[in-house]
Amino acid sequence: ICFSCYIWNISFVRELLPDLKKILPQVEFWAGGPEVSYDAVEFLKKNPAFFGVMVGEGEETFHELAGYYIERKPETLSEIRGVAFRDENKDRNIVHTGWRELMDLSKVPFAYSNLTEFKNRIIYYESSRGCPFSCSYCLSSIDKKLRFRDTEMVKKELQFFIDNKVPQVKFVDRTFNCKHDHAMAIWKYINEHDNGVTNFHFEISADLLREEELQEMSTMRPGLIQLEIGVQSTNPDTIKAIHRTMDFEKLK
């Protein structure tokens, strides 16, 4: 059983696992996500109910881990990159196999081929990973490499949502408009293919918006898009202290 661990659920996961392990002593529990990836060994030392941790991006690691448990391919956990686990053959000493190389975002499988189970739910979608900023309090600042899903692939997948009249598609890109060409192409596409129903939600940095983008937005149907604007602080001293950059005049 695997748990994705984020800032909003990590305390509950830690509290739940000791009792869950008592109920299911034969089950090996795994954790993954940003709250456990960067101190995986220490996390396992402090949380004995967990057997292992998947570190970093999980798509390929989870696939191989499932292969290990289902058909023992690979034959040992040590053959899987991106995991830390208790080695049963070494007095349960913790083994860390190291981080995987960051994957090509265009190779991540499309998760919504069948929308039946997602009917009337928010669809979460990702067209980029990484963040251009280095806010000192945020784990996103650790990943310095910005990666983008192929724009034509994104358009094709968004058309699937549009054709199915999904109520809302929420982009989880950390700063959607950090690359102008990428953002502009997607905004232009959803504007041209508006079905009158689907709403698209984006997290953006307002001071990065260009006149071309604002002009495109001015032609959109009211409610076609929602913009969640990240303003970490309006105090210049605070912005400097957290190593963030922001054009306050443009933001105003």
Regions picked out by a protein language model, each given a short descriptive name:
Residues 1-99:
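Glycine-rich beta-alpha loop elements in corrinoid/cobalamin-binding modules
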Residues 56, 85, 98-102, 110, ...:
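Active-site donor-binding loop signature of nucleotide-sugar glycosyltransferases
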Residues 69, 103-106:
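Short, charged/polar, Gly/Pro-enriched secondary-structure boundary elements
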Residues 106-252:
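Radical SAM [4Fe-4S] cluster-binding motif and immediate context
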Residues 6-10, 35-37, 58-61, 101-104, ...:
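Short, solvent-exposed loop/turn segments at secondary-structure junctions
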